[in-house]
């Protein structure tokens, strides 16, 4: 103890004669991370947190991006339960998957997106890797572009786009640009603006497209509009990067929802594609997705696959196994696949029905506004056209929670609360 006391005294004396030593000691005592600032809260998670604190029995959370049944409860698809039971009965091991994921899952995902009779699938001029849901697919795709797309660093996003698109591409080293997409005056697709902007994008740039059920607007191009977009993309030699998070969940028909992707490929446009099974199989927490690159030939596909594996290895080595087994079991079992397609249609139909009921109830309330855009839009989300101050009133006066831009998750609307929602919207818009 005496020696320790002497050391402290000597240290104090040294500090008195050498101020630099005192500063160094102070620096050592402070945290390495004192300079780290508090980051902004996630806007959607913030909505959910505020909702949870609300004690109003009529409160509604229309911010969450997950399907709910007509009782407002999370829904596990019966086909998923059956697939899990089949997997459990096999007593399979939990060994690592290959870097690219479960092979049969990757093949089935490509066939689901491109069509079982697709020339691309038959010729093998594609590569599909399993990813950590749609977000992981986007990040792998963005990193692949950053490393190998030598023509441009610019990625053109529709305005608006899913909020996570920007940080995903930005953090991968790409630069973000935008093109017109949503028309706030009509609450619909700004086809003229989009086509004009896309036609001016520098050649050999990356164009991000939502394959169906555009998030956050719910506004999709019609097939004839997709055809014109594809013509411009081909003429301008743009690289089409498709995000397809809602196949089957938009219209209830998986082939219809994948129409744009397949049309582009038929026109000789070699796209890349991100898929997610969060929404259409309800596998939110399993993180099941896929990333596909369409190539010139099978040889090129093998080279691309090798580089995708090199990208994946230092990120997460290999993807999780359970969710991929569930999806693969459903997609490759004729009976389960048929059941799943019916369940997906049931979810899509419920959302479409809620859109119709909301408009009907708004009319019953006596609203004189046009709400046709609610039924014209498609998928889980709806851009209501509500202004920020109206959204604020909905929250304060009616305990109805949504993002400030007026986007609602129609999956959070039920036959039990649609009347209340219509009444509240009418009160803040009349």
UniProtKB/Swiss-Prot annotation:
Protein name: Aspartate aminotransferase, mitochondrial
Residues where N6-acetyllysine is found: 59, 73, 82, 90, 122, 159, 185, 234, 279, 296, 302, 309, 338, 345, 363-364, 387, 396, 404
Binding-site list for substrate: 65, 162, 215, 407
Other noteworthy facts: In eukaryotes there are cytoplasmic, mitochondrial and chloroplastic isozymes.
The species this protein was found in: Oryctolagus cuniculus (Rabbit)
Keyword entries, A-Z: Acetylation, Aminotransferase, Cell membrane, Lipid transport, Membrane, Methylation, Mitochondrion, Nitration, Phosphoprotein, Pyridoxal phosphate, Transferase, Transit peptide, Transport
Keyword NAD: no
Location within or outside the cell: Mitochondrion matrix; Cell membrane
Residues with 3'-nitrotyrosine modification: 96
Modification N6-succinyllysine occurs at: 73, 90, 122, 159, 185, 227, 296, 309, 338, 363, 396, 404
Enzyme class per UniProt: transferase
Record-stated family: Belongs to the class-I pyridoxal-phosphate-dependent aminotransferase family.
Positions of post-translational Phosphothreonine modification: 48
């Amino acid at each position: 103890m005496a020696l320790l006391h002497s050391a402290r005294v000597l240290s104090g004396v040294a500090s008195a004669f050498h101020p630099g030593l005192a500063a160094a000691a102070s620096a050592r005592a402070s945290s390495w991370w004192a300079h780290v600032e508090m980051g902004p809260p996630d806007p959607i998670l913030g909505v959910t947190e505020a909702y949870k604190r609300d004690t109003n029995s009529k409160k509604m959370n229309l911010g969450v991006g997950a399907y709910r049944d007509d009782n407002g409860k999370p829904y596990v698809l019966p086909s998923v339960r059956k697939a899990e039971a089949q997997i459990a009965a096999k007593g399979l091991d939990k060994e690592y998957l290959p870097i690219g994921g479960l092979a049969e899952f990757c093949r089935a995902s490509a066939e689901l997106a491109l069509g079982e009779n697709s020339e691309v699938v038959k010729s093998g001029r594609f590569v599909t890797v399993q990813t950590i849901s749609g977000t992981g697919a986007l990040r792998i795709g963005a990193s692949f572009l950053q490393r190998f797309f030598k023509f441009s660093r610019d990625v053109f996003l529709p305005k608006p786009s899913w909020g996570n698109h920007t940080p995903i591409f930005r953090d991968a080293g790409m630069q973000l640009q935008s093109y017109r997409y949503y028309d706030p005056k009509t609450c619909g697709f700004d086809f003229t603006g989009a086509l004009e902007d896309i036609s001016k994008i520098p050649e050999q740039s990356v164009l991000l497209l939502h394959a169906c059920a555009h998030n956050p607007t719910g506004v999709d191009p019609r097939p004839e509009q997709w055809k014109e977009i594809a013509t411009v993309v081909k003429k301008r030699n743009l690289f089409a990067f498709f995000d397809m998070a809602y196949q089957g969940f938009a219209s209830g028909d998986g082939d219809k929802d994948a129409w744009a992707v397949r049309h582009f490929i038929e026109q000789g446009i070699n796209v890349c594609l991100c898929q997610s099974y969060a929404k259409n199989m309800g596998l939110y927490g399993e993180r099941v997705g896929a990333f596909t690159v369409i190539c010139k030939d099978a040889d090129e596909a093998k080279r691309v696959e090798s580089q995708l594996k090199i990208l994946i290895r230092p990120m997460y080595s290999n993807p999780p196994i359970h969710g991929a087994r569930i999806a693969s079991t459903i997609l490759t079992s004729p009976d389960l696949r048929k059941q799943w397609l019916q369940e997906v249609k049931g979810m899509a139909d419920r959302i479409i029905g809620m859109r119709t009921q909301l408009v009907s109830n708004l009319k019953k309330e006596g609203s004189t506004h046009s709400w046709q855009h609610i039924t014209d839009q498609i998928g889980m989300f709806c851009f209501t056209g509500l202004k920020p101050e109206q959204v604020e009133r909905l929250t304060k006066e009616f305990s109805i929670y949504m993002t400030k831009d007026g986007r609602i998750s129609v999956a959070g609307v039920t036959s039990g609360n649609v009347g209340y929602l219509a009444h509240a919207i009418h009160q803040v818009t009349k």
